[in-house]
Amino acid sequence: MSKITADVLLKEGLPKSIHLKDLKKLNLSKMHLEMKDIDPKLFSQMVNLDELDISHNTLSELPDNLGLHNLRILNFADNHVEDVTVLKQFPNLEEVIYEDNIYLTVSDNYKVFCLLPKLRRLNNKDITSLANHVRFVNHRELSNRVEAHWDSKFKDNLPDKPSSQKINAVAKDFIKSVVNNIKYGPSSLKEFVRWKALGCSGKKRDSADDCTEGSPTKRTRIQHELQSIPLSPRKSNRLQNSPLSLTPIKRKQETSTQGTPSKSTETKSPKVALKSTPSKKQSNESSAKINGKQKLSLTPKIIQKALDNIEPLHFLQCHSKNNSCEDFKTQLWACAFEPILDSSSPKAVATCGGDSVCIIDCETGKVMKKYKVTGEEFFTLVWTTLTMIGKDEQKRKINVLAAGGKHGVVRIIHAKVSLCYGEIKAHKKAISIMCFSPKQDTFLFTGSYDKRIILWDIGVPDCDYNFRPSQLLTLDTTSVPLRMCLVPSCPDEFLVAACEDGCFAWDIRLDKKQGRRSYEVELNFPIYKEERKDNDFHVIDSLAFLNEDIIASKSVMQGSIYLWSWEKTLKTRKTKNVKKLDAVILAQMKWSSSETPYLVLSTSPERYCVFCGDEDGKIWIYDLDSCKADLQRGKLCSVVKEPTKILSWPILFSPKEKVEKTLINVVTVDPTMEYLVALTDINIVSIWKIK
C-alpha cells in the first residue's frame, strides 16, 4: 500500500485546506518514499501546486504523468534518480534541485536546460545565461553540424521520390552515423551531445518523411570579420558616413511639416540664478561627496514659472571634468529613471555623459551615486531589475544599470551598493545605444558603430557578484544604429532600430537557425520623396513606442514627427521576399526646423505624450490623450498637429557665464509624470517638476 494518501498530502501541504486543488506548497522530504508511493492520479489533483519537495528519499525515477503543470520549484535532492528527461512534463519549472543523485552528471544539467525553457536556477545557482547559451547557441551549432553531416553523407542516398522503406533505411543509418560522428565540446558533455544530436537527426528524419521530391539544402552561413579600427564618436562626427553633411543646407520651410512654434504655445524664458558654489547652509544644497571629491550642482532660484503645471527645479553640472564649475563643454547623452522597487525609494534618474554616470535624486537634486571611468565617454545607459539570491538564500530584487560608450564596453552597476560588478567587451567600436528586453530581464541588446546589434544574456550575479554573460545573437546593420526598441506586443520576435541610413526591423526569434542575421524589412517614410543632393532624409535619429503599436519617429531636418502603426505597416507585407515597406502614417506633429542631428524624442505611454528638445533649449510637448481613441483605431489624421506646450530654456546665471540657450539632446519623464529631465550639450542636467 502506498505511503502517500490524500490525507497525508493535505497534512503536509500549504495552505491548509480540505481540497487537494488548493495546495500551493508540499513537503514530502525524508519520508523514505519509493517510486511505488507516488500515485499520479492523486498528484494530478493538485492542479495549483507551485512548490514540491521530495528530497532525501529513495526514488529511482519520477513518474512521467504527474500532471503538475503549474509547478515552479522542484526539489528531489538526495535520491537515486537516473534520468532527467521526465522533467519536460513540468514546462513552468523555474528552479530545480537534484544534488546528491549520484547517477546524474553535467550532461544531465545541459539536458535540463533544453527541456525546461523557464528554468533560472539549478542546484541553488543561477544558470540563466548558461542555460540560454545552451538552448540557443549550442543548439544552433549542433543543428548546423547535423545538417552538414546529412548534406555531405546522406542527401544523395535518397532518390527523387523515395519510398517509405528507403527513407527508413537511410534514416536508420543517418541517426547511427550522427551519434558516432558528431562531436562538440568537452568529453564531459559527450552524453549530452549524443542526446542533442539524436534529437536534431530525428527532426531531419521527420523532414525526410515529408519529402516527395528532393531534400533539404544546406544553409549558407554568413561570416563577417569584426572591424578593429577604434572610433571616438561625438556629435561633430557621428554623421561622417551619412549622406547628410555636418553643415547641411537649410531646408525651405514647409508649413505642413515644419516651422517655429506658435506664440500661443510657447512660454517666455524665466530667469534663473545659477549657483556654482553650494553653501552648506542652503537647504537646497545639491552637492554630494563621492570618492572624496566634491560634486558641483547648480540649483536655480525660480523667478518665474515656465508653465502653470511644469516648473524648473534643478540645473546640475554633475558631469564636469575635474569637477570644474566652468565646464560647459561636456556633452550629456542619455538618461533613464530607476525602476521603483518600494514606495520609500526616492525618484532617481541615471544620466551619462563625458567619463561619468550619475544617479540623481530628482526631488532634492542630490547626486546620490557617481561612477567614473577615466578616458571613457558614455553614450547610453539602461536599467533592468533582477532577482538575486543573497548569502542568506533569500530572494531580493535589485536594480542594475548597464552603461556603455566609446570603448565598446558594457559596464554593469549595482547602483545601491555603488558596485560595478561586471564588464562585457561587447564591441570593438563605440556603443551607440542599448536596451533591455521587457520580457527577459537579463537580455541586453547593444548597438554599435561597428554596424552590429548584439543580444547578450548578462545573467544574474550570485551573492559574491560573480556573473557569466553569454552572446546569443548578432544582427547586422547597414549603418550605425542610433535608437532601438523591442516591439511591445511581441518583444521576443521583433526589434526596430533607427539608423543613420533608415529604419529597419529584425526577426529576433532565438529558435531560428541563423545566429547572425540581416534585417527583415526596411521602413520607408514620406519625407524620403523630398530627397535632395545634400540630404536624403534617411538619418532617423529618434524612435519610441507610444503604445504597443504606434511608433513616434523623426528624420534629421524633417521638421516634424511621424506617428505610425507597426501592425498596419507589417500587414502590407504580402510575402517574405518583400524587404521594403511604406510606414502607415497615422499623424504628423510639427517640430523644430532644426538642422542639428541626434535630438532624441521620448514617449510616455502611460499619459500618451511625446517629448522632444530642440537646438534652442526648448522642450516640445505633445499631449495626445484627446486623439488617443482615433490613433488606437488607426484613424488617419490629415492635419499636422501643433505641440500642446513648449517649455523655454530659462536664462541661467553663473559667476562667469550666462547660459541663454543650448541643445537639448534628450528628454524623458518618469512613468508617474512627476518629473521631466532634459540633458544638454553644455554639461547641464535640467530637472523639471510636473505639478
Curated annotation (Swiss-Prot):
Organism lineage string: Eukaryota, Metazoa, Chordata, Craniata, Vertebrata
Polar residues compositional bias, start-end: 255-264, 276-291
Any Pfam family matching the protein: LRR_LRWD1
Gene Ontology CC: one annotated term: centrosome
Subunit text: Component of the ORC complex.
GO molecular function, one term: chromatin binding
Coiled-coil residue windows: none
Function: Required for G1/S transition. Recruits and stabilizes the origin recognition complex (ORC) onto chromatin during G1 to establish pre-replication complex (preRC) and to heterochromatic sites in post-replicated cells. Binds a combination of DNA and histone methylation repressive marks on heterochromatin. Required for silencing of major satellite repeats. May be important ORC2, ORC3 and ORC4 stability.
InterPro entries: Leu-rich_rpt, LRR_dom_sf, LRR_LRWD1_dom, LRWD1, WD40/YVTN_repeat-like_dom_sf, WD40_repeat_CS, WD40_repeat_dom_sf, WD40_rpt
Family according to the record: Belongs to the LRWD1 family.
Coarse class of the protein's main subcellular location: nucleus
GO biological process, one term: establishment of protein localization to chromatin
Protein name, UniProt field: Leucine-rich repeat and WD repeat-containing protein 1
Record comment regarding domains: The entire WD repeat region is required for the interaction with ORC complex components, as well as for association with chromatin and for binding to histone methylation marks.
PANTHER family noted in UniProt: LEUCINE-RICH REPEAT AND WD REPEAT-CONTAINING PROTEIN 1, OPTICIN
Region (Disordered): 202-291
Keywords per UniProt: Centromere, Chromatin regulator, Chromosome, Cytoplasm, Cytoskeleton, DNA replication, Kinetochore, Leucine-rich repeat, Nucleus, Repeat, Telomere, WD repeat
Compartments where found: Nucleus; Chromosome, Centromere; Chromosome, Telomere; Cytoplasm, Cytoskeleton, Microtubule organizing center, Centrosome
Organism: Xenopus tropicalis
Sequence ranges of the LRR repeats: 22-45, 48-69, 70-91
Stretches forming WD repeats: 426-466, 476-516, 535-574, 593-632, 659-691
